[in-house]
Amino acid sequence: MKLLAVRRLFRIQRVVIRYRLDDLLFALPLPWFLLAVRYVLPWRWFPRKQLELSRGARLRLALQDLGPIFIKFGQILSTRRDLLPEDIADELMLLQDRVPPFDSQQSMKLIEEQLGKKISEVFSRFDVDPLASASVAQVHAAQLKTGEEVVVKVIRPGLKPIIGQDLAWLFILARAAERFSADARLLHPVDVVADYEKTIYDELDLLREAANASQLKRNFEGSPLLYVPQVYWDWCRPKVLVMERIYGVQVTDLATLADQRTDMKMLAERGVEIFFTQVFRDSFFHADMHPGNIFVSTVNPWSPQYIAIDCGIVGSLTPEDQDYLARNLFAFFKRDYRRVAQLHIDSGWVPAETKLNEFEAAIRTVCEPIFEKPLKDISFGQVLMRLFQTARRFNMEVQPQLVLLQKTLLNIEGLGRQLYPDLDLWNTAQPFLERWMRERMSPKTVLGNLHSQMEQLPHLANMTRDLLERMSQPHAKDPAPPWKKRKDDWFLRLLGAAHLVGGVMLAIGGPLNQLGHWPAGIMVAVGVYLIVRR
């Protein structure tokens, strides 16, 4: 093992001892042979200083001591309220990703290496002192030679080896927890670390962030709701991002917003509208909408516009997920818990063999108390969190896109009620969802979907043969995973479309019309059944 990795291990051990995290570990229901280990740990042989801190505070302080990679892991973990006890999740939300800036000469050297030009050849002004600094990157203000005011985001040098070492230790801890603790297995710690690994490496690629920002800007081009700064692609590289500099009021600066007479009710409602527009219209949403990434334009405070930055983390939903999510929300607010349970099974989010009655009862037990509150006080994010927590007890598959969505909704909801405490999220969102559902079922949309499915008709014979071969295999008894179930559903709808079109063509005339209309009727009926079946 490399010396650096060994030193890192000793550092982790010292922090564990300092904040008595071993006490938290041995409080878990571990096997006897692991619990026996506490008697051979030298630092447990002597009295230790008592810490007048909650377990969540001790964990938070330990992560802060371990540095930026562990801090960011704790921040991401804090969004998994479906996995964590509430007291720990609340403490982890307090983690601040603030670290001292790295040397500006290093920053300028890296920019020149990435751009292949001297700073003075690209920028007429470059501020050596950074505007902001975080664990992954820091930002400098500058002006392009062409006159545009910009910000230059630069990845910290030497991050990858540090991230690799810290991730290796996180995976070791996660695998040990999964192996030796039944409670830990329910939390899927290895999956959580794997999600973090993908997120942190994605954040190291600034071209990905630039592409996300360009997509979001295009989706809201000309919109009064949201403005996204311009990306200057000529000067973007994997470790350098150049964007338009924006000037606005941070969304949590309530005093300044009040001074400029901002319509706070409209601002809060527009935040909700932006969220649902991203999720249901665009299926592409900014998944890191914490207050540090959101500003409010100083123009037209009576019709306020949001400004979003830092598009490193985004999410998207499939059309099936969009549909099931909307139906779940409607069913929940109607207290139709059987429908909620059935939708979870139909979507493949929980296993097909789940007992519907038991699942319905569990959802009712957890969610019914929520309706003791007035409708305007009900939290959408809490609704989703409770549903996911309940579904996890029934072996719900981890859905990364839904976890991102729940995190984003909690952020938007908390922010909206901070701006306007009487915000009624359901009444604000309901018209949008109802309009989206109507548009989804409109003849124009149905015909558009039918047209896209018809494009697959040339492949129908091969797909039919493949499906029959799969069904004839002895191992075909194994339950299909959710993604495969959706593909098979899509194939059956395509087959239904082919029957429907074939039946119509047969009915209006063709080489077989001497047989009468009954074959056409059968084909149309089969087609309709296959298309609308659940």
From Swiss-Prot:
Compartments where located: Cell inner membrane
Record-annotated active site: D288
GO molecular function terms noted in the UniProt entry: ATP binding; protein kinase activity
Binding site for ATP: L131, A132, S133, A134, S135, V136, A137, Q138, V139, K153
Main location: membrane
Record field: transmembrane: 23-43, 490-510, 512-532
GO CC field: plasma membrane
Functional pathway: Cofactor biosynthesis; ubiquinone biosynthesis [regulation]
Keywords, sorted A to Z: ATP-binding, Cell inner membrane, Cell membrane, Kinase, Membrane, Nucleotide-binding, Transferase, Transmembrane, Transmembrane helix, Ubiquinone biosynthesis
Membrane topology listed for this record: Multi-pass membrane protein
Keyword Repeat appears in the UniProt entry: no
Protein kinase domain span: 125-492
Gene Ontology BP, a term: regulation of ubiquinone biosynthetic process
Key word Lipoprotein present: no
EC number: 2.7.-.-
Family matches, as NCBIfam families: PRK04750.1, UbiB
Family, similarity comment: Belongs to the ABC1 family. UbiB subfamily.
Function: Is probably a protein kinase regulator of UbiI activity which is involved in aerobic coenzyme Q (ubiquinone) biosynthesis.
Protein name per its UniProtKB record: Probable protein kinase UbiB
The organism of origin for this protein: Pseudomonas fluorescens (strain SBW25)
Gene label: ubiB
